[in-house]
Each structure stands twice: as structure tokens, then as C-alpha cells.
Regions:
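Structured catalytic-domain cores with a bias toward divalent-metal coordination
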Residues: 1-393
Length: 393
């Protein structure tokens, strides 16, 4: 099995329900994918049982399905959400404080950053909703110092299913597959209404409700990070560091933050005994069309994981292409050439990656808040120094 000390146990609670208690299946269980309504039902049960969790409606899809955002932090931080949001709004637009660095330092010292995680924008990449349910439970109930520090220094915000229309279609298709073992079944033609993989190329056009809902949430909360979860290559690729060409409107401070977070992720997960974790790769950092780039274009930090997945909850023997387990300077601990891979393995990697990222972020929260302010200030100054900033037609 592929596991880590962060996911090889589940903290007990007499009052707060686990996903298994509400849905009848542990996170990452074989042969089970929850519909959107079940995912949301779990998060609302979690919020009803814990003062450290709040659920917010953030809009609806083209077909009328609800999208949610779930905030998790210490009870005192959740009680002060509005005041914290007002402080972050001033850091997000330094004109409101006359570009005063001393005032910004005061706001940084008083504020708590927001780390926004999104899952299941690509409907055939099925693991993130269950991983995020269990992650939320851990963050809400675990008394371990590692988790308590995250909970007291970061507001974790989660949208467990971004493409809600496509998720339900995918679950229906997967359930047909379970009811007809051994029979071929087609991939989804469309996920949303009417869009498939390119729902993650909409951050410029903003033509989809899911894009507008996530953008409104990120900007409305004045979050510092937007971390989008995907599935493809083995075993976890933090593509945040990326490769050239770099978009000229990306602040060099952000490039440094990508490096900080990405390489720390690789180091920490390698120390925890998880092979196949790497960054850099060949993902370019040019196009602002990806959902995560809503953060990069609003002075935050865009992040994305690609975790190994099976396009469903089947447990499958996977033989890797030699290129996938080649040892390189950026992949010194490559994945195994052949594995029996389950959705639980996928969930262990996603949760471990997110927890190590949240841990690093919580330990450097003041730094990232100050960077958030500086990037915002520099974005105001850049048109005067480097222009043009826009074209009017």
C-alpha cells in the first residue's frame, strides 16, 4: 500500500462523524463514488457537528446543481471571518491604505491567510471529493500538534466538486460499469453543459458558471492560494513550479513562491516514504486560462497536483511507461514500474500532499501574507513602470 504517517490513522471523535459514518464507505473505498449531493451532505453533517467547520453556497451550475465552499479553522478564527476578510481586502488593494508599508505590516500581523483547495473540475479524475472529505474531518478533529498548528494559522477553504454536473454524470456512468462487469463502456462525451476537459481553460473567457463561482469565491475571500486537484501521471506531480516560458505578468515573487512550496512538498513527501513525488516537469507557466491561474492573476499563488488515478474507483494493475519512472534531476525518487493502484492510494497521496503544503504554509503564514501585499502593490505600480497594462477597444 502507499501510505504515510499523516494518513495511516484516522483520529477518533465521539461527536463528529467520519465519511464512513455518514455515507457508509471510507474515503477511497473500492467500487464507490459518491454523487455531489452525498459529498455535500457529508460536509453539512461535519459542519453541524463541529464549530470548526462552516459551509457556504457559492453558486449553481448551468444545470442548477449547487456548488459549495467549506471553511475549516479554529472556532475563534471562524468567528472572526468578516473582520479577517476586511483586513485581507486592504492587503489585496494597497490603495485603500495609501500604499503604506507600515500599515500593511500591522494588517499582516493581525490576519490569517486563506488556502483555497478545489477538486473534481475534470469529471473522469474521480478521487479528490473523497480525499477532501477525509482531509476536512482530519482538520476538524485531530488533536495532533501538526494539525492543530494548521488549524490555528490557516483558514482552509474547500470546494470538493467544481464540475458538479459532470461529477454526477461520471458517477452514473461508473455505477453502470459496476452493474455490468466485463463490458466496455464509453467515456463521457461532455462533463458540463456543454464542455469537457476545456472547462479548465476558461479563466480568461469566464464563460462557465463554475469558473465564475470559483473566481468570485477566491476574490471575495481574498485568498492567498488556489490549489486545484487533478489526476494523471504517477504518483504525485506538483506542477506548480512549471517550466518556461513564464508569463511576463507573473510577479517574480510568485515564481519564488512556486519554488518554495513545490520543492518543500517533494522533500517532505519523500521523507515520509512516498515514491514518485516530483515537480518541475514540462508544464508551462504561460497561459492564464487554467482555473488555478485565477490566483496568479490576482496576486495569489496558483497550485495544481496531478495524482495517479484510474478513472474511477476500480483497483487496477498498472504498468508504467519507462518515461514515467525515469530517474531525472527533478524526479530523483521515481515511481515503481508496476503497481496495483487503488483509489485509496490516490487519496493517501492527495491528503499527504495537501497536509504537507498546509503545514509549510502555516509555518510561513506571515511571509506569504506580506508577499500577497507586495505583489498587489507591485501590480499597481507596474503599469506606470513597464506598461502598457491594458488595451481599450
Amino acid at each position: 500500500s502507499f501510505n504515510s504517517p499523516l494518513t495511516d490513522y484516522l483520529p477518533a471523535s465521539a461527536s463528529v462523524p467520519t465519511p464512513d459514518k455518514v455515507l457508509g464507505h471510507i474515503a477511497g473505498a473500492p467500487d464507490y463514488l459518491p454523487h455531489v449531493a452525498d459529498v455535500h451532505r457529508y460536509f453539512r453533517a461535519l459542519a453541524a457537528a463541529s464549530p470548526r467547520v462552516k459551509v457556504f453556497t457559492i453558486g449553481k451550475s448551468e444545470e442548477g446543481r449547487e456548488m459549495i465552499a467549506v471553511a475549516i479553522a479554529d472556532e475563534s478564527l471562524l468567528a472572526g471571518l468578516d473582520a479577517n476578510r476586511a483586513r485581507l481586502a486592504q492587503l489585496a488593494d494597497p490603495r485603500t491604505i495609501a500604499m503604506d508599508d507600515a500599515k500593511a505590516d500591522q494588517l499582516v500581523a493581525q490576519s490569517t491567510p486563506v488556502y483555497y483547495i478545489t477538486g473534481a473540475i475534470h469529471s473522469t479524475e474521480t478521487g479528490s471529493p473523497t480525499a477532501l472529505m477525509e482531509l476536512a474531518y482530519r482538520l476538524a478533529v485531530d488533536a495532533a500538534p501538526y494539525i492543530k498548528h494548521i488549524r490555528s494559522h490557516v483558514i482552509t477553504l474547500i470546494t470538493p466538486v467544481v464540475e458538479v454536473d459532470g461529477r454526477d454524470r461520471m458517477v452514473d456512468l461508473y455505477n453502470w460499469h459496476l452493474a455490468h462487469p466485463g463490458q466496455n463502456y464509453p467515456r463521457l462525451m461532455y462533463w458540463g453543459h456543454y464542455v469537457a476537459h476545456d472547462n479548465n481553460r476558461d479563466a480568461m473567457g469566464m464563460s462557465l458558471a463554475l469558473t465564475r463561482n470559483v473566481a468570485d469565491t477566491f476574490v471575495g475571500w481574498h485568498a492567498q492560494v488556489l490549489h486545484d486537484l487533478h489526476e494523471s501521471v504517477p504518483f504525485l506531480y506538483d506542477n506548480t513550479v512549471g517550466d518556461g516560458p513564464y508569463n511576463a505578468w507573473i510577479d517574480p515573487i510568485l515564481t519564488g513562491e512556486w519554488q518554495q512550496l513545490g520543492w518543500d512538498n517533494v522533500q517532505q513527501m519523500t521523507r515520509l516514504g512516498m515514491p514518485g513525488v516530483f515537480t518541475h516537469g514540462d508544464f508551462d507557466t504561460w497561459s492564464p486560462g487554467y482555473l488555478m491561474f485565477i490566483a496568479a492573476m490576482h496576486n495569489g499563488i496558483s497550485r495544481l497536483y496531478e495524482t495517479f488515478g484510474n478513472d474511477g474507483a476500480d483497483t487496477v494493475k498498472r504498468t508504467l511507461d519507462p518515461a514515467d519512472y525515469q530517474r531525472t534531476w527533478y524526479r530523483p525518487n521515481p515511481p515503481l514500474p508496476e503497481v496495483v493502484w487503488s483509489q485509496r492510494d490516490n487519496n493517501n497521496y492527495e491528503q499527504t500532499g495537501l497536509l504537507t503544503a498546509l503545514n509549510y504554509f502555516s509555518g510561513n503564514s506571515q511571509l506569504f501574507l506580506k508577499n500577497f501585499y507586495l505583489k498587489s502593490k507591485r501590480s499597481i505600480e507596474k503599469p506606470l513602470q513597464a506598461g502598457p497594462a491594458a488595451y481599450v477597444f
